[in-house]
């Protein structure tokens, strides 16, 4: 009888611990999603997730969300070394999440986003060796979830970044971004990336249309991204192509 009581207690404590962890992760992501209201929310989000990972190293969600947070921390620092430090941390937590569950689209996505940022920070020519891995990761994500708009965007921008001789193709970029916008028309980054693609083609009329759409989004999928990143970038690009 005592054996069964012990087993029941273990199960109960496990459930309570899992519920507590879920609540902490929810709180961390609430802070992450409202970082446009308070800049300190991002580091607070990191600290909470770090605590969960330290107490539960195999918590899938905590690891891939921490990977996501480090990606944003990397975007927010100034120097190349600081950026690489943040992105590499994000990569490692994404890698851990993949090991926990190789069929997690989120684990693969935040891993590959950090890998991509490492490549962008080092420069395309210094990061060509990363391209096969990025392609493999994106294809894995889209196999798990064919409508993963983030993965479609990464794949699209890979075609945008690569030189033509190495497979770059801005028309393919536009095709993939169009597909992503059909799936989620409130994902503001897609419009900025689409505009950048048209600017590359010197099609400024279409570029302006997509840049103006950014300000028209009423219910953004990622409000903090719209306010902190996408809208300012759209306005900056509109100024750059003014009169063209």
Model-derived regions, located:
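N-terminal leader/linker segments that initiate helical-solenoid repeat arrays
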Residues: 16-70
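Helix-turn-helix repeat elements of alpha-solenoid scaffolds
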Residues: 34-50, 83-93, 127-133, 166-174
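Terminal, low-structured helical/coil segments at or just beyond the last alpha-helical repeat
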Residues: 24, 200, 206-244
């Amino acid at each position: 009888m005592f054996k069964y009581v012990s087993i029941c207690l273990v199960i109960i404590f496990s459930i309570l611990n899992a519920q507590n962890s879920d609540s902490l992760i929810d709180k961390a992501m609430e802070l992450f999603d409202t970082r446009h209201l308070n800049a300190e929310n991002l580091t607070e989000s990191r600290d909470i997730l770090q605590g969960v990972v330290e107490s539960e190293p195999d918590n899938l969600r905590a690891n891939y969300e921490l990977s996501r947070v480090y990606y944003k921390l990397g975007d927010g620092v100034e120097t190349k070394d600081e950026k690489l430090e943040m992105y590499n941390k994000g990569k490692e937590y994404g890698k851990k999440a993949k090991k926990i569950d190789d069929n997690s689209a989120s684990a693969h996505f935040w891993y590959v986003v950090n890998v991509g940022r490492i490549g962008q920070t080092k420069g395309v020519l210094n990061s060509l060796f990363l391209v096969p891995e990025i392609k493999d990761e994106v294809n894995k994500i889209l196999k798990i979830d064919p409508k993963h708009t983030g993965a479609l965007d990464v794949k699209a921008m890979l075609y945008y970044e690569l030189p033509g001789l190495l497979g770059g193709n801005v028309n393919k970029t536009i095709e993939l971004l169009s597909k992503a916008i059909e799936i989620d028309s409130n994902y503001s980054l897609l419009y900025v990336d689409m505009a950048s693609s048209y600017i590359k083609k010197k099609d400024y009329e279409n570029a302006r249309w997509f840049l103006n759409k950014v300000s028209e989004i009423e219910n953004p999928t990622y409000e903090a991204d719209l306010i902190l990143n996408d809208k300012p970038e759209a306005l900056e690009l509109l100024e750059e192509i003014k009169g063209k």
